[in-house]
Amino acid sequence: MPELPEVETVRLGLEPVLTGRRLTRVEARRPDLRFPLPVDFVQRLTGARILSLSRRGKYLLAALDRDATLLIHLGMTGRFEIEGAAAPGGFALAAPADPKHAHVLFETDEAARIIYYDARRFGFMDIFDDGDDRLAGLGPEPLGPEFNAAFLAEAFADRRQSPKTLLLDQRIVAGLGNI
């Protein structure tokens, strides 16, 4: 499963292609990934401008100009390919992956096509309105200022689980995994 470093690498690759761009076409080639896509997924995203692309733990977050955010979790095998635009980090590939695993397509006003592939379909996407606190239960980022020795001592106090188990708990620290 992609962990924080891999998700951040994906964010950095997508950022120059998506930030500030309008989604001129969105195609959901199936109604679900791990979970059903929102019924208005295509309608809410088509025509939206992506204001910024960020990451929280293992989640990619695309802030939209419609007071909403597109949330993406890559699951185990989710990945993006970019066609029609040069992207740093080698995300723009000449030969696309197996099309049967191409589940969501995004086209931008800059003629880029961003395709989400997920062979095992463990990833998911959702759209939520600004002010929604669905990620509030995540712990601090491991590279953020809140994650320090005092925080760990408090988080581990009176717990019977192993340190590894506690560190993998996304409520304690967001984005860590077992890779």
What are these regions (language model features)?
Residues 1-68:
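Extended, highly charged segments
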Residues 22-41, 54, 80, 153-179:
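Basic, nucleic-acid-binding surfaces and adjacent catalytic neighborhoods in DNA/RNA-processing proteins
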Residues 70-175:
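Phosphate/anion-contacting hairpin/loop surfaces
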